[in-house]
């Protein structure tokens, strides 16, 4: 149960991360409406992203007409979790004239105008560990959370404390990988251990059924391509290999 609530919490964080993608993609079409004011598209998009997410660093590229966009934000915090970097390459459709910036739903309407995109998210182990140690003190009895990244995936462990007639203090551990498939972003190749003993497959399957997908593909408000998920000792890279634009206008920002 403790592991379930932990992963439900993280599912919400991943969802807000993909909403960042949506805002980033939507922002490009705010630019053309003010082109007559001589503020370039990439500058307008960049300023919107800085205002919304306060990144440590940001690079935005855009073609002259705004049909193609590349943006990379470094050091953003989403729901308490620091994300090392988020990148997006997008090919856009023509914006309808009736969408306005002050429309409450403009972010999501504009996200629908993405024809094709590639995204990338880089999450560092040190940032995830800091989040679990400081922000998640107690999730339904789950204490002393520890997280470890490796080439084999993610290991999350901790003590589950519950009281029923008397107090239980059980060491629990989950070893898992991530996959992006037709359902969305999911945990896969998962092993559940309680007090060091591997649990039956049906228990692990029940846990995964309640957790997966972390992000439903249908809830991502625009088409984004993710081709692989790479694990190392210090980071996870969820990527569709977005590449910077060539011969495009560039706007750079660094937090003071």
Q: Where do the protein language model's features map onto the residues?
A:
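N-terminal Sec-pathway targeting helices
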Residues: 9-19
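Bacterial N-terminal signal peptides
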Residues: 18-27
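Extracellular/lumenal and peripheral-membrane lipid-interaction modules
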Residues: 30-256
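Hydrophobic alpha-helical segments of integral membrane proteins
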Residues: 6, 26-31
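Short, Lys/Arg-enriched N-terminal segments with co-localized hydrophobic residues
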Residues: 1-9
């Amino acid at each position: 149960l403790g592991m379930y609530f932990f992963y439900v919490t993280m599912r919400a964080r991943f969802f807000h991360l993909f909403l960042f993608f949506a805002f980033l993609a939507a922002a490009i079409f705010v630019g053309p409406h003010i082109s007559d004011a001589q503020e370039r598209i990439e500058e307008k998009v960049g300023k919107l992203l800085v205002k919304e997410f306060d990144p440590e660093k940001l690079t935005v590229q855009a073609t002259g007409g705004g049909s193609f966009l590349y943006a990379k934000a470094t050091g953003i915090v989403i729901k308490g979790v620091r994300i090392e970097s988020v990148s997006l390459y997008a090919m856009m459709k023509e914006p309808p004239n009736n969408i306005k910036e002050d429309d409450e739903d403009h972010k999501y309407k504009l996200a629908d105008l993405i024809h094709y995109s590639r995204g990338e998210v880089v999450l560092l182990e040190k940032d995830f560990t800091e989040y679990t140690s400081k922000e998640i003190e107690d999730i339904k009895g789950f204490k002393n959370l520890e997280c470890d990244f490796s080439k084999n995936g993610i290991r999350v462990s901790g003590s589950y404390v519950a009281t029923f007639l008397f107090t239980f203090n059980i060491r629990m551990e989950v070893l898992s990988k991530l996959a992006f498939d037709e359902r969305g972003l999911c945990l896969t190749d998962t092993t559940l251990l309680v007090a060091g003993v591997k649990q039956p497959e049906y228990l692990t399957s029940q846990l995964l059924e309640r957790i997966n997908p972390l992000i439903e593909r249908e809830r991502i408000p625009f088409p984004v391509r993710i081709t692989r998920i790479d694990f190392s000792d210090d980071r996870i890279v969820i990527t569709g290999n977005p590449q910077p634009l060539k011969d495009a206008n560039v706007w750079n920002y660094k937090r003071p």
